[in-house]
Amino acid sequence: MSSIADRKTTGITFNIQKYSVHDGPGIRTVVFLKGCPLKCRWCSNPESQRKSVELAYNTGRCLTLAKCVRCVEICTAGAISRAEDDTISIDRALCNDCEQLCSGACPSNALITYGAHKTVDEVLRAVEQDSLFYARSGGGMTISGGEPFAQPAFTLALLREARRRRVHTAVETCGYASWDDMAAALPFLNYVLYDIKNLDDARHKEATGVSNQRIVENLRALRAEFPGIPVLVRTPVIPGFNDNEADIAAIAALTRELGVSYQLLPYHRLGTQKYHFLDREAPMGEVTLDAETMRRLEAVVAQTADS
């Protein structure tokens, strides 16, 4: 496809995060895309799960309808009404992927729009603002989500155009995608961050909603067909799911077999508030991960690597 066509390709992003140092080499800009085929109970970005633009509501910022009624008046779908405490109630069945006039009209930013339609050119203009940092640190752009391959055409166009502009590229993927979509994008990638959550298929399906077979198959295919691309496999350590020696040792053994790097990520609760903003329950509740468990599991990874 031509550069002109790629630059005009449109996708739905929900954040462009500057100066990230944890999502690939160097200083990076992370482009977060909407949509994910998994429904992980521990997901810290609930706003990433659905492909559509979504409206969130932070009641703590609301001026209440006693002082401001802009959102009620401007909503063309009739989705916003008065709640008993003079805040607002959002009918999610009526709220649709509109122009989000209500969040634009909200003077206190209590209404938040998660998601924006952007072209490849718009995204890369934001990414290229930090080109000096990339040059000095070996950084670049990382496409994350959600799941980048849930928007395969946009992801491919974004990677192709980034390559034309000599921007170092990386992708964060759960691996649950069409291999054809992944294989089309991989020639334009410099680095891959790949999630493996559990090798027990039944437990993986129970916790994420999908089988892990395609995920493991795609990782093996990636290593076989694109051996020159550095891969970092990452596992979020989740209390009650994979915070044990057997699960982590099994994944560590797979990464050793495939010759890829491996990293554990500690569970955190930073996304809990966003569930409430979207009128959803946070599935993990008040669960926490203790530091001693992480130290023990990191020792397991080190031992497996040395064996």
Swiss-Prot record:
Record GO terms (molecular function): 4 iron, 4 sulfur cluster binding; metal ion binding; oxidoreductase activity
Annotated Radical SAM core domain residues: 22-307
Binding site for [4Fe-4S] cluster 2: C62, C68, C71, C106
GO biological process terms held by the UniProt record: alkanesulfonate catabolic process
PANTHER family for the chain: PYRUVATE FORMATE-LYASE 2-ACTIVATING ENZYME, PYRUVATE FORMATE-LYASE-ACTIVATING ENZYME
PROSITE patterns associated with the record: 4FE4S_FER_2, RADICAL_ACTIVATING, RADICAL_SAM
Transmembrane regions: none
Entry keyword annotation includes Metal-binding: yes
Subunit structure: Monomer.
Catalysed reactions, as listed in the record: glycyl-[protein] + reduced [flavodoxin] + S-adenosyl-L-methionine = glycin-2-yl radical-[protein] + semiquinone [flavodoxin] + 5'-deoxyadenosine + L-methionine + H(+)
Annotated protein name in UniProt: Isethionate sulfite-lyase activating enzyme
Record: residues binding [4Fe-4S] cluster 3: C75, C95, C98, C102
Function: Involved in an anaerobic respiration pathway that converts the sulfonate isethionate (2-hydroxyethanesulfonate) to ammonia, acetate and sulfide. Catalyzes activation of the isethionate sulfite-lyase IseG under anaerobic conditions by generation of an organic free radical on a glycine residue, via a homolytic cleavage of S-adenosyl-L-methionine (SAM).
Keyword Iron-sulfur: yes
Cofactor note: Binds 3 [4Fe-4S] clusters. One cluster is coordinated with 3 cysteines and an exchangeable S-adenosyl-L-methionine.
E.C. code: 1.97.1.-
Domain 4Fe-4S ferredoxin-type: 53-85, 86-117
Listed cofactors: [4Fe-4S] cluster
Keywords recorded for this protein, A-Z: 4Fe-4S, Iron, Iron-sulfur, Metal-binding, Oxidoreductase, Repeat, S-adenosyl-L-methionine
Gene3D superfamilies: Aldolase class I
Alphabetical list of InterPro entries matching this protein: 4Fe4S_Fe-S-bd (IPR017896), Aldolase_TIM (IPR013785), BssD/PflA/YjjW (IPR040074), Organic_radical-activating (IPR034457), Organic_radical_activase (IPR012839), Radical_activat_CS (IPR001989), rSAM (IPR007197)
Binding site for S-adenosyl-L-methionine: W42, C43, S44, G146, D195, I196, K197, H268
Residues involved in [4Fe-4S] cluster 1 binding: C36, C40, C43
Pathway(s) it belongs to: Organosulfur degradation; alkanesulfonate degradation
Highest taxon in the source lineage: Bacteria
Stated family: Belongs to the organic radical-activating enzymes family.
